C-alpha cells in the first residue's frame, strides 16, 4: 500500500507548470460580464470583462479589473458609478464585438444594435437581455500589476433567473 507522501508526490508529479493564460482554461467557464458605465456625453459604454468577483456579503461588494489604459475603468473612477451585468446568450456576438473597440471612440450600443433599458435610481442603462445587474458605487481602486482593481459596494441587485447568462469558455487566450 502507498503512503500518503508517495500519493501526494505522484499527484504533484502529474501536474505541470502553467502560465496564467493556460490556468484560465482550467477555471472556465467564467461569467462574462458587461461593465456598463456613463460616457462623457451621457450615453452608456459597454465593456466585456471576465475579471470580476464577489468580495463581501456585508456590505455586498464586487470587484472587477480593467487594463490601466481602459476607457471604462477611467469613466468608473471619474463618475464613481457602474452597473456590472451578466448579459444573456443572445448577446454573445454583440458582447464579443464590444471587446474589439474602445468606448472612447465608438458608440458600442449603436454599433452593435443592443436594445437598452433604464434602471431605476441610475443614469446608466443596461442591455434589455440581462440575467443579472449589480448597480454599484466605487469605493476604492487599486493598481494590481497591469490592471486596476475597482472595488465597489453593490447598491442594488436585479435579476431574472429565467434568462440564461453568457459564459466565457476556454480561458482568455481565444
Per-range role (PLM):
Residues 2-174:
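Basic, polyanion-binding surface patches
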Amino acid at each position: 500500500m502507498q503512503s500518503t507522501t508517495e500519493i501526494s508526490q505522484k499527484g504533484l508529479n502529474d501536474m505541470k507548470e502553467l502560465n496564467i493564460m493556460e490556468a484560465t482554461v482550467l477555471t472556465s467557464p467564467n461569467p462574462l460580464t458587461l461593465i456598463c458605465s456613463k460616457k462623457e456625453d451621457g450615453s452608456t459604454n459597454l465593456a466585456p470583462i471576465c475579471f470580476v468577483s464577489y468580495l463581501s456579503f456585508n456590505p455586498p461588494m464586487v470587484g472587477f479589473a480593467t487594463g490601466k489604459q481602459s476607457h471604462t475603468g477611467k469613466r468608473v473612477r471619474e463618475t464613481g458609478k457602474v452597473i456590472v451585468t451578466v448579459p444573456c446568450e443572445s448577446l454573445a456576438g454583440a458582447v464579443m464585438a464590444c471587446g474589439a473597440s474602445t468606448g472612447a471612440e465608438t458608440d458600442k450600443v449603436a454599433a452593435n444594435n443592443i436594445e437598452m433599458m433604464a434602471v431605476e435610481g441610475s443614469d446608466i442603462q443596461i442591455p434589455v437581455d440581462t440575467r443579472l445587474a449589480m448597480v454599484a458605487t466605487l469605493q476604492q481602486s487599486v493598481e494590481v500589476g497591469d490592471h486596476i482593481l475597482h472595488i465597489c459596494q453593490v447598491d442594488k441587485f436585479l435579476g431574472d433567473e429565467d434568462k440564461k447568462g453568457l459564459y466565457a469558455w476556454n480561458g482568455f487566450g481565444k
